[in-house]
C-alpha cells in the first residue's frame, strides 16, 4: 500500500443538504492549514470557513480532525462537512488537490487503509459495502453483525482451534512418547471431530448469510404442462411467461428477479422435463438441468390432476434421484382448483408439500411465506452475519481438508499428512479474514467499493 494522502467525496454524488469531503494520510494536516488556516482540535467539531488559495471563502461548514492511529483508516483523517451542492464539493476537492502530495482516492481505498492498518479485517471491510447495499432489514442487520466482528469471531475461533491441533500433532511427531500412540489415543480424533462440527455450523450460518445478501435462486421444475410458467407469473405478479394448454410451450429458461418484503429472490422457469426427439426442446431441457444443478431450492411442480401421490419419490423417482444430494426440494401440487384439495401445507417424508392453484393464485401467498422463511425472513437474526460467495468457497475448502485429515488419521494413522491437511485448512480459513490473502484478491474486493469508502 502506498503512503499517499488521498481525498474523495464521502457522501453520494448529487444534490443534498450536506456534502462530506474526506482526506486521509500524513498530508491531512497540511490540507487543514491550507484550507482552514488552522488545525482543528482532535475529535472536536469546528465550524469554520473553507477557503481557496487566495483566501476567498468556498463554503462554510464543520471540520473534524482525527489523529492517527485513532481514526477509521488508522491515518490522520480530516473531514470537511459543507453544503451538498455538487459544484461546491467539486470546488473543494479541487482546492484540496492543490496541496502537494494529495491525490484522488481509488474505490474502497479508505477501507483498504483501515484493513492494512489493522483497524478492521477483510470480512468487516466487506460488511461496510454490504451494509450500504443492503436491500432488506435482514440484510442490513446481518451486515452490521459482520461489521461488528461476529463472522470474524467465528472464523478466528476456528483458525485458533485448527492451529492448536496442528501444533499438537507436529509436536507429538517431533517428540514422541514411546509409551503412548498419540494418533490412536482418541485425543486428536475428538479435537478434530469438534472442529469439523463447529465448521459445519459456521457453514450453515454463512450459507444463510449469503442468501440474505445475494438472494435465493429458486428453480421451478417438473413435467410439461404442470403449470410452471403460471407459477412464475403468479410469483412475479406479471405475465412474464407465455401460458398455453400445449405441452412444451416453454423451451428456454425464463428469469424473474423479485423481492419478498425486501428479500431478493431469483426465480427460474424451465422447460418441461421429458424424453423428446425435438432438438430445440432437448437444448431447453439440458439448460433446465444446468439451472437445477446450481439452484438453492427446487420447486417440484406436479399436476395434481394426474396423481394423488405427495412423496416425490413416488411421483417421479428418476427426477428426484438425479438431483444434487444437498439440494432442497419443495413439492407443489398444482391445479387445486380442479382437484378440490385443501390449500394447505404438509410435511411428507422430509418434504414440504404445498397445494396451490397457480392459475387462480390460490395458495401462492402461503408459498411466498415459505420462500421467505427459507431465506431467513422469520429467523431470529441475533448473532447472524452476512457472507459472500468467496467465504462459502473458503469454508468448503477448509472442510474438504479437514475431511481428508480425518481420513489420514482414521485409515492410515498418518500424522504428517494430517498436519499438512490441518495447515491447508488453516490457510483457507485465514483467507476469509485477510490474514493470508493475495494482493489480487484484495484489489478485486476493494475496487467494488464506493469511491469515498
UniProtKB/Swiss-Prot annotation:
Superkingdom field: Bacteria
Cystine pairings recorded for this chain: none
Annotated Mg(2+) binding sites: 229, 250
Location(s) in or outside the cell: Cytoplasm
Cofactor binding, per record: Binds 1 potassium ion per subunit.
GO cellular component: cytosol
Keyword Repeat assigned: no
SUPFAM superfamilies for this protein: P-loop containing nucleoside triphosphate hydrolases, TrmE connector domain
Binding site for (6S)-5-formyl-5,6,7,8-tetrahydrofolate: 22, 79, 119, 453
Binding residues for K(+): 225, 244, 246, 249
Pfam families: MMR_HSR1 (PF01926), MnmE_helical (PF12631), TrmE_N (PF10396)
Amino acids binding GTP: 225-230, 244-250, 269-272, 334-337
One GO molecular-function entry: GTP binding
UniProt record, GO biological process: tRNA methylation; tRNA wobble uridine modification
Cofactor entry: K(+)
Enzyme's top EC category: hydrolase
UniProt-listed InterPro entries: G_TrmE, GTP-bd, GTP-bd_TrmE_N, GTPase_MnmE, MnmE_dom2, MnmE_helical, P-loop_NTPase, Small_GTP-bd
PROSITE patterns: G_TRME
E.C. no: 3.6.-.-
Nucleotide-binding found in the keyword field: yes
Keywords: Cytoplasm, GTP-binding, Hydrolase, Magnesium, Metal-binding, Nucleotide-binding, Potassium, tRNA processing
CDD domains in UniProt: trmE (cd04164), TrmE_N (cd14858)
Family: Belongs to the TRAFAC class TrmE-Era-EngA-EngB-Septin-like GTPase superfamily. TrmE GTPase family.
This protein's name: tRNA modification GTPase MnmE
Organism expressing this protein natively: Shewanella sp. (strain W3-18-1)
Gene encoding the protein: mnmE
